[in-house]
Swiss-Prot record:
Residues 1034-1187 form the (+)RNA virus helicase C-terminal domain. It comes from Tobacco rattle virus (isolate PpK20). Disulfide bonds: none annotated. PROSITE patterns: ALPHAVIRUS_MT, PSRV_HELICASE, RDRP_SSRNA_POS. Its EC number is 2.1.1.-, 2.7.7.-, 2.7.7.48, 3.6.4.13. Residues 86-300 form the Alphavirus-like MT domain. Residues 65-425 are annotated as: Methyltransferase. It comes from the Viruses. One of its GO terms (molecular function) is ATP hydrolysis activity. Belongs to the ssRNA positive-strand viruses RNA-directed RNA polymerase family. Keywords: ATP-binding, Coiled coil, Helicase, Hydrolase, Methyltransferase, Nucleotide-binding, Nucleotidyltransferase, RNA-binding, RNA-directed RNA polymerase, Transferase, Viral RNA replication. GO terms for biological process: DNA-templated transcription; methylation; mRNA modification; RNA processing; viral RNA genome replication. This is Replicase large subunit.
Length: 1707
């Protein structure tokens, strides 16, 4: 029956039986099928099945191609039983159920139309009608947005496919279908009788009649009326004389009550926000559907509406799932009859709200202290019981704890008359608390005690309503008008200094004192109402406002100042009550309104509104013009883009929300009569007008000379009589004759190039400052490129909404909707990027961001036509842009100042020296860090200096941003941690301060200046070697003796300490971040920012209050106890260098615990210092004398013998002992149960943006397999079971452990430079082919190379290109664990390797393309570049034979970790450029970009889904080649490969041979900051590539596999039988033939000693290894069968084994 798609309830009327009857029925059917009643029941079932089959055969079949689950198929048949649905399951697409449902709904609508009548399809499904031959239907398909364009293209492709099938004979077309198909023959995109791209209102395809458009009498609309206003629909139906429209639309009646809810039948949801309603589908990557809420509500309510003498009547006739099917009738010439409020919503059934009531609850917004209301849905029984209980409490019992206790105890089970009744829907715990508070307040308000208390409070206070404060506010508004007048009169830019209107703290209460009323300040909601309404009525009294105008003005003010009105404020006069659901719905449906008032003529409403606004404006202008003859209320201000926003005039100016009294404060000085106030106030305004007239001409002339970037009005505030002005005087920004720009916005130009290096002058101070400006400008350009790249990707749809963990902290703000499209993780950015679409390239502006409760409230310039603005990490702080603006105006002559350096060890008292030697009243004191600056200010304050210390002691950034006008100068400049700053910054500080002497505190061995732009080469960044005087300090007051012992190795002179602590440092080994010890109040220090983020999240999750900083951030600070943490096992050459080691170990005074996942130089130093005796440590105290130290030196000689035959010697014991000597303890570790223990014990994982499906755990450990038992015990891991937990572990340790090392990079420039180098160094330009790749022969060749299984999967998938989700990937894990050749297997549980791959259909699209591209790359590559792709050992040896054994080479190995996961947007763009170089089409490039940007991975087997950005997918169509290209490009960018003799690369492995003595800089820092690669550089005596040593023999170079890895793999525990072992033997024997040469064996012995730090000789073990490899009989002795018996070598089919082993056999 399941195959027939029938449900059991359809076979018999089971639903009409009682529960007992159903039980008997199933018992007889299942337990007694042979009894008479059972047989009768079976016959009934068979007859019923036959009847249903016959009935279905009479129906026309409806073919559903979408892939649906069995549950969805059953649901579809249950909702639409009238159709004979045939499921093909050959079209996989997003929200397939909804797509299939639309076809059936379209047929339902068409069935309502007479068979021979013409039909207009509004927003129609014309491609569906073509397949059914419905030639009477004309579809109006307007392209309103990009989604409609995409659908139109999809339909055209579908139509083309139908034609192709008809021509090939695969499809038979009916006569009607052929007619409809012929309409598209001339031009598929042109309008025709079948469809047009006009709106229903604009469609003229049926011609005209009497000057009006003709249309069909019937219309249908399938999910398209959302986008049509009801008025437009009615107007069109009237004009085209359409009688009836049948429609279907998603029906969400719950949206009238709650803002968000489910649409269960389509697995979707709705959401109301900002006047819009959103429809979307769960677990769906596509965009949501957005519609106007007010228009949707009209269709939802379905009220009869009259229009131009016609009444439009809504008739809802069926609800199918979440879709309402209804008709709109146009009725002419009859009086309208209204519906009662009970006729519509009473029929709507919402099952989860049955017997529930609506209860208002109240909450207080913590940030604003504003009372808000929301509706809560509670069971009526529960609510009645709670109200009854609270009403019976006495005054002493009426407490919040009692109310909460009762509500909580009855939330799940309600006790009525002693019986327990389970609540149908319990209340959320948070809402339950709010309900308790609301019910308590209701009861307390109802009792007279609270009334007496309120009266007592009101008698003790007196609100202010005098005219004095009112006129104070109005006067400032007048100054705003004058500022606008200056801007208009001078035709200049924005007004720089604004005077505002809205005080942060408004006047609230006053008390009578002998000196007059004393004002108090408080953020009071009530007082805002009093003050601002007083302003309105004061103005109204002057201008004789009419009542309606005044009321409108009051409403405007209330909206502007967020003074809420209405039901959300708790009304104590009307206690809280609840409403029945149906009554609540019915209250929304008003039947008393006439048709004309339900939908008024909008043009008339607009005219009335404009007239009312004009009256308000004229009244406001009347008052201003009466006092100021030059005032013009109609003036329009024109200005360049500004963050200040557009200026208004007239009434708009008076009502504008600004922030002026935040800069001015007023205080009461004396009591003045109202008459005196009014007289002096008005006279003051007249006097001020004369002053303004004098300012305008001079200011306009200044602007015309171009000496300022914007208008700056510097004038005194007008102070009403009785008040004194306490606003500090404003000083202009002037620097040595030049005007310093005060920038409110920055221009962001797309395609900007990095600036050119400045010319070297020969003067260090000049060159350093020029370079500093060059660096700041390069940083600005790189940041602009990153900002515009993010906006470009969002605009093109590469970055989409609905994702997680957006790159660079991206946030996208919709300017029109005033809401976040993509909400950033953090807000309060200093600037916001506002692109300007008027420009040809991607350009725009950075504007100062204005925030309010996490939302942007900027008034963006409309003329730029930007729909969206963005924020990101690059806009969070823009201090360097302001500094660049300020410093660019300064002269760059030589600095006449002497520079001194106090070079001291950590904790030597450099800050103390500043405090003791500096006088902040006359000297300038600067520091590079905020914490250090605050510490200096605090210590100066303790010494009692009379000056304002915060004005004299500053951070360097603050000094350069605010003091370039010469406001802070001194003869002596004290600069703390000067070596952390760029030398040019120090010179600038000395120049601005006018210093003659600069005393710099620093340490040449600690962290120096680190540039944030990787592409610039700085030559003058350091002051080291340029000081006039250097004073060394080698005594530390901070560091204990063991730290002093470590520091003594790195400093000249002897380091001594005053700290009495001897031993302070310990090492604690951890496996992961979960094991980090959590100590409240401790100071945690990490090496990397990524480690800091992990630790901050861990502390927050565990609710531990502690501070976390990086080593760089902690330089210059002191802590008592420090926990130094390393959670990343990979080595970073930047953050783990010597200077970081010194800073990390010298921050504490008492204790340091180093918790690390890996042994490194830091742990080595700590262990060595801990091993020192007390006597050894005593010499590092200040009181001890210096002891002499001696060291011995031994010369090492190595004797090398010539070649000879390899002896056939050695035993298994020799191999085991050699392995134990290399890796002590590895063979003792039994890992066979590791996977089982992990799977069956608790495991705490923290994963971001991961969805898991519970119940997918399967006990795979019960599956028993038999394997051979290895005799040799190595750390070869056991084969793992691929469980859900293993998938999550692998995802966490691999895909979610991506490094984030890249600094600011101008990606466009770096890509261009890299491509230029590729063409000049790697490829022969003459051999590069860029012709199109689309070639049938290439496709067929790729197809023939695929397996039969792959071909079958591709053929079975019949989706078209537009139906494929390219950003969706499959996820799996490998069960084999990669073996390690170190000691980590003893304590580390290795994560399995992950494979992220596309579907076969997508690979079949890209596979042939990339195969051709890679062949073209190999053909064009220079011969000394060796790309290890599909090469055997012999092939690789042949490619390196050209190396001369007589020549001397320097071999360089670069080891990169987390290579796939390091990819970001820059890598993707570079890869696309390489593809384009070799002929990739733009359409394929776009699809590839989309498929690698914002991606979703799904592990179907283990029930897991995650979101990943940009990472190179390990299983897509070009993984290995793309990785290899990235490796080559990175090395090409940072190493002089043009000098290389040989470059061998493949994947993330590389080996480069340079001529001996070639000089180059360590590339690892640049590979990290420019390319985001964690890497290490190796220079061993014997190089290695892809697990093979490159040995130099007497005649050539030769690659030989690493014997240590070979021996490790001989401990493999997953070899099935002797036949499998024979296959391994063939592969081993072939790849390790070089072990038969003793010259190779001896050199391998040296290689092992060099690589693995092995002090012994390995020749005997290598001989034993060759002995067991060269003979299969000997190899069999290394294994036993499952019964622990020896293997029989004779039981092998060698022919079968030979066939199984290919050139690339991997065992």
């Amino acid at each position: 029956m399941a195959n027939g798609n029938f449900k059991l309830s359809q076979l018999l009327n089971v639903d009409e039986m009682s529960a007992e009857q159903r039980s008997h029925f199933f018992d007889l059917m299942l337990t007694k099928p042979d009894c008479e009643i059972g047989q009768m029941m079976q016959r009934v079932v068979v007859d019923k099945v036959d009847d249903m089959i016959r009935e279905r055969k009479t129906k026309d079949p409806v073919i559903v191609h979408e892939v649906l689950s069995q549950k969805e198929q059953n649901k579809l048949m249950e909702i639409y039983p009238e159709f004979n649905i045939v499921f093909k399951d050959d079209k996989n697409m997003v929200h397939g159920f909804a797509a299939a449902e639309r076809k059936l709904q379209a047929l339902l609508l068409l069935d309502r139309v007479p068979a021979l009548q013409e039909v207009d399809d509004i927003g129609g499904q014309w491609s569906f009608w073509v397949t059914r031959g419905e030639k009477r239907i004309h579809s109006c398909c307007p392209n309103l947005d990009i989604r409609d364009d995409q659908r139109e293209i999809s339909r055209q492709i579908f139509l083309t496919a139908i034609g192709d099938q008809a021509r090939s004979g695969k499809r038979q077309m009916s006569e009607n279908e052929l007619w409809m198909y012929d309409q598209f023959r001339k031009n598929i995109a042109a309008p025709n009788a079948v469809r047009c791209n006009n709106t229903y209102h604009g469609c003229t395809c049926r011609g005209f009649s009497d000057g009006k458009k003709k249309g069909a009498q019937y219309a249908i609309a399938l999910h398209s009326l959302y986008d049509f206003k009801l008025k437009d629909l009615m107007a069109t139906m009237v004009e085209k004389k359409t009688k009836v429209g049948h429609a279907a639309m998603l029906f969400a009646p719950e949206s009238m009550l709650v803002d968000e809810g489910p649409l269960p039948s389509v697995d979707g949801y709705y959401m109301k926000k900002n006047g819009k309603i959103y429809f979307g589908f769960e677990k769906d990557p596509s965009f949501s559907y957005i519609h106007d809420w007010e228009e949707y509500k009209k269709y939802l309510l379905g009220k009869p509406v009259s229009y131009q003498g016609n009444v439009f009547y809504f008739e809802p006739w069926q609800v199918r799932g979440d879709t309402m099917l209804f008709s709109i009738y146009r009725i002419a010439g009859v009086p309208r009859r209204s519906l009662s409020s009970q006729e519509y919503y009473r029929r709507i059934y919402i099952s989860r709200w049955e017997n529930m009531v609506v209860v208002p609850i109240f909450d207080l917004v913590e940030s604003t202290r504003e009372l808000v209301k929301k509706d809560l849905f509670v069971e009526k029984q529960f609510m009645d019981k709670c109200l009854d209980y609270i009403a019976r409490l006495s005054d002493q019992q009426l407490t919040i704890s009692n109310v909460k206790s009762y509500l909580s105890s009855n939330n799940w089970v309600l006790f009525i008359n002693g019986a327990a009744v389970k609540n149908k829907q319990s209340v959320d715990s948070r809402d339950l608390q709010l309900l308790a508070q609301t019910l308590l307040v209701k009861e307390q308000v109802a009792r007279p005690v609270m009334r007496e208390l309120r009266e007592a409070i009101l008698t003790e206070t007196k609100p202010i309503t005098s005219l004095t404060d009112v006129l104070g506010l109005i006067s400032r508004k007048m100054w705003k008008q004058f500022a606008n007048k200056i801007a208009v009169g001078g035709f200049v830019g924005m007004v720089g200094t604004l005077i505002g209107f809205y005080p942060k703290k408004v006047l609230t209460w006053a008390k009578d004192t002998p000196n007059g009323p004393e004002l108090c300040y408080e953020n009071s909601h009530k007082t805002k109402v009093i003050v601002f309404l007083s302003v309105v009525y004061a103005i109204g009294g002057i201008t004789l406002m009419r009542r309606d105008i005044r009321d409108g003005l009051v409403k405007k003010l209330c909206d502007m100042f967020d003074i809420k009105r209405g039901a959300h404020v708790l009304d104590v006069e009307n206690p809280c009550r609840y409403y029945d659901i149906n009554d609540f719905f019915s209250s929304l449906y008003s039947a008393s309104e006439s048709g004309e008032t339900v939908l008024p003529d909008l043009s008339e409403v607009k005219a009335k509104s404009d007239k009312l606004l004009q009256q308000k404006k004229e009244i406001a202008d009347e008052f201003l013009s009466a006092k100021f003859s030059n005032y013009s209320g109609s003036s329009v201000r024109t200005s360049p883009p500004s963050v200040v926003g557009s200026s208004r005039s007239g009434l708009g100016l008076l009502l504008e929300d600004s922030n002026v009294l935040t800069q001015a404060r007023v205080g009461v000085s004396r009591k003045v009569a109202d008459e005196e106030i009014m007289e002096q106030f008005l006279s003051g305004l007249i006097d001020t007008e004369a002053e303004i007239d004098e300012v305008v001409p001079a200011f306009s002339a200044e602007c015309e000379r171009g000496e300022t970037s914007g208008t700056k009005v510097l004038c005194n505030l007008l102070t009403p009589p009785g008040f004194e002005n306490v606003l500090p005087a404003v000083k202009p920004l002037v620097s040595k004759g030049k005007t310093v720009k005060r920038v409110d916005y920055f221009q962001v130009m797309g395609g900007e190039r990095l600036p050119k290096r400045p010319v070297v002058s020969g003067d260090d101070s000049v060159d350093a400052r020029r370079e500093f400006l060059y660096y700041l400008d390069a940083e600005r350009v790189a940041q602009n490129d990153e900002i515009m790249s993010l906006y470009r990707d969002y605009s093109r749809g590469v970055i989409r909404t609905g994702g997680q963990n957006y790159p660079h902290g991206l946030g996208v703000w919709d300017v029109e909707m005033k809401n976040w499209c993509i909400r950033p993780v953090v807000t309060e950015h200093a600037y916001v990027s506002n692109p300007d679409k008027r420009m040809d390239d991607w350009s725009g502006y950075l504007e100062v961001a204005v925030w309010e409760r996490g939302m942007l409230v900027n008034d963006f310039a409309v003329e730029r036509m930007s729909d969206y603005v963005i924020v990101c990490d690059q806009t969070y702080l823009c201090n360097n842009r302001l500094i660049l603006d300020n410093l660019s105006a300064l002269d760059l002559g030589p600095v006449n100042c002497s520079f001194e350096l106090v070079d001291g060890v950590p904790g030597c008292g450099k800050s103390t020296m500043i405090v003791n030697s500096a006088n902040p009243c006359v000297d300038v004191v600067l520091s590079t860090g905020r914490a250090a600056t605050d510490d200096l200010i605090e210590r100066f304050a303790s010494k009692g200096f009379p000056c304002k210390l915060k004005r004299r002691v500053k951070t360097v950034d603050s000094f350069l941003m605010h003091c370039v006008d010469g406001s802070l100068t001194g003869d002596v400049l004290h600069f703390d941690e000067a070596l952390m700053a760029h030398a040019g910054m120090v010179y600038f500080c000395a120049q601005i301060a006018g210093a003659k002497r600069c005393i710099c505190q620093g340490d040449q061995n600690q962290i120096s200046f680190k540039p944030r732009v990787s592409q610039v080469d700085l030559r003058f960044s350091s002051l080291v070697g340029k000081f006039d005087i250097v004073t060394e300090k080698r005594e530390t007051y901070r560091s204990p003796a063991d730290v002093a012992a470590v520091l003594n190795k790195y400093y000249t002179g002897d380091v001594r300490t005053h700290n009495a602590t001897a031993n302070s440092m310990t090492v604690r080994k951890i496996v992961s971040k979960e094991q980090v010890s959590l100590k409240p109040g401790a100071q945690y220090i990490t090496f990397l920012q990524s480690e800091k983020k992990e630790l901050v999240n861990l502390l927050a999750l565990r609710k531990v209050a502690a501070k976390v900083s990086t080593v760089h951030e902690s330089q210059g600070e002191t802590f008592k106890d420090v926990v130094l943490v390393r959670t990343k096992p990979t080595d970073d050459s930047i953050a783990r260098g010597r200077e970081y080691l010194i800073v990390a170990l010298s921050r504490h005074t008492q204790s340091l615990v180093y918790e690390t996942v890996k042994e490194d130089d830091v742990s080595k130093e700590i262990r060595e210092s801990a091993a020192l005796t007390k006597a050894a440590l005593a010499r590092f105290f200040v009181t001890e004398t210096v002891l002499x130290r001696f060291r011995s030196r031994f010369d090492v000689f190595r004797h090398h013998e010539g070649p000879c035959a390899v002896p056939d010697s050695g035993t298994i014991t020799d191999l085991e002992m050699w392995y134990d000597a290399l890796f002590p303890g590895n063979s003792l570790r039994d890992s066979s149960l590791d996977g089982y223990l992990v799977a069956t014990t608790d495991c705490n994982l923290r994963l971001d943006n991961v969805t898991i499906k519970s119940g997918n755990w399967k006990d795979k450990f019960a599956e028993k397999e038999t394997f051979l038992k290895p005799v040799i015990r190595t750390a070869m891991p056991d084969k793992r079971k691929t469980t859900q937990l293993e998938s999550l572990l692998a995802l966490q340790k691999r895909n979610q452990a991506a490094p984030d090392l890249q600094e600011n990079v101008h990606a466009t420039v770096l890509i261009e430079e890299t491509m230029k180098k590729l063409k000049s160094v790697v490829y022969d330009v003459g051999k590069i082919r860029a012709d199109p790749i689309v070639n049938r022969a290439q496709m067929e060749r790729w197809w023939r190379n695929q397996s039969t299984a792959v071909q079958a999967k591709v053929v079975a998938d019949v989706r078209e290109l537009h139906e494929i989700d390219y950003s969706s990937y499959m996820f799996m894990i490998k069960s084999d664990v990669k073996p390690k050749t170190d000691l980590t297997p003893q304590f580390e549980y290795s994560a399995l390797q992950t494979v992220v791959y596309h579907e076969k259909l997508i690979n079949s699209l890209f596979g042939p393309i990339f195969k051709e591209i890679n062949e073209r790359k190999l053909d064009a590559m220079q011969p000394h570049f060796v790309f290890n792709t599909r090469m055997t050992s012999s092939d690789l040896n042949d490619r390196v034979k050209f190396l001369n054994t007589e020549a001397a080479y320097d071999f360089v190995e670069i080891d990169m970790s987390k290579f796939d996961k390091s990819a970001n947007r820059f890598h993707l763009q570079l890869q696309l450029e390489i593809y384009r170089l070799f002929g990739l089409d733009e359409w394929a490039a776009f699809l590839w970009e989309v498929s690698h940007t914002q991606t979703t991975v799904r592990d179907i087997q283990n029930g897991m889904m995650a979101h990943i950005w940009y990472q190179q997918k390990s299983g897509d169509a070009d993984t290995y080649n793309a990785n290899s290209d990235r490796t080559l490009c990175a090395l090409l960018s940072e190493l002089p490969l043009e000098k290389a003799v040989m470059v061998t690369y493949g994947g993330d492995d590389s080996l480069i041979a340079f001529p001996r003595g070639t000089q180059f800089v360590d590339p690892c820092p640049k590979l990290a900051t420019k390319w985001n690669f964690e890497c290490k550089i190796f220079k061993y005596d014997v190089p290695m590539f892809c697990g093979k040593f490159l040995l130099k023999t007497s005649s050539c170079y030769e690659f030989v596999p690493d014997p240590v890895k070979v021996l490790t793999k001989l401990g493999k525990k997953s070899i099935k039988d002797v036949q499998h072992l024979a296959e391994i033997y063939i592969s081993l024997n072939d790849s390790n033939r070089a072990l038969g040469n003793y010259m190779v064996v001896s050199k391998l012995s040296e290689s092992v000693s060099d690589r693995y730090l092995y002090k012994g000789d390995s020749v005997h073990a290598l001989c034993a290894l060759w002995k067991h490899i060269k003979s299969f009989t000997a190899l069999c002795t290394l294994f036993r069968d499952e019964n622990d018996k020896e293997l029989n070598p004779a039981k092998v089919d060698w022919k079968k084994a030979q066939r199984a082993v290919s050139n690339f056999y991997d065992w």
